[in-house]
Amino acid sequence: MITKKKIELLAPAGNLEILKVAVDSGADSVYLGLKEYSARAGADNFTLDELEEGVDYAHTRSAKVFLAVNTLMSDNEFELFYPTIAEAVNIGVDGLIVQDLAVLTKLASDFPDVTINCSTQMNIYGADEFKKLADLGANRVVLPRELSCDEIETRTKIALGYNLETEVFAHGAVCVCASGLCLFSAMNRSGTRSGNRGSCAQPCREEYQLYNNGLKLKDGHLLSPKDRDVSEYLARLIKSGVSSLKIEGRMRDANYVRSAVYCYRRMIDAYYEGKLDKDLIKEIRYDLLINFNRGGAFTTQYLSGSKDDHLLSGEYPGKYGVRIGRISRLEAGNGLVTVGIKNGAWWT
């Protein structure tokens, strides 16, 4: 039976430096990948020697380490990679994140003392799948980003009945397609970069043109979602029984991870101290926006269950910043920019 405890803050670690930054900034756990067979092949990732140093660093600071093995594998690939997974378990990783059901079954059987997490790449929407996963040896399900708060709460209650924890993405990038089901990347350009093999080309971040009967309706970054932020829903997610809040971003740099972890650590601690209010959420959300956002805002469309037009980032899919005012004058010769701030003051 799962004992109710303080919700876990799970942070990304694309390399050893970022692992240390995440732990020092307040993460309860980190997740990472080795050089092969993780869903973020573009990250630096870890050698076994780096993994050993990272596990030791985390454990001496009471943090856990989860190893992502969350791609689909052929039988031959798994046979070749299995000794590496066994070595990682011997080093002391606390859990394994998997996508492939055959991999899940084998690892749960061979390593019963290691937590097995079902990746969001498994695309577990139906609550009827929880019992099957529990019977195979899973300990936690990472729920799809596309669920509303009501759906998360319902599924969490059902999962707990099968002794399964649930994990929810709290912050970071949102895919335009359901995780684990997107074939868009494999169709793009070279035709070889599969999102289910760790090599997503992110074609949703590119520019497109929309036509109807030969008439161009619009163009731009039409498929690029804004990033996700659950700060205004954090209290509800905790009350629903979710076990872990996950920050996306194994390909983000150390500054991004430091800021995101610090902000969510503040909110989680404030909740348990009875101090999480609208003013604190507003302050922290502003800090998160400065850290990174697409389109000048975050999206909560899936969490709210609404069907508005605030999901996509708009004209620009990269780091957007925050609006501080309107540029009123440029003096190119001496590099002077005059900006009008909302409160009527002037900065030069």
Language-model regions, residue ranges each:
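Aromatic- and glycine-enriched glycan-recognition loops and surfaces
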Residues: A43-E52
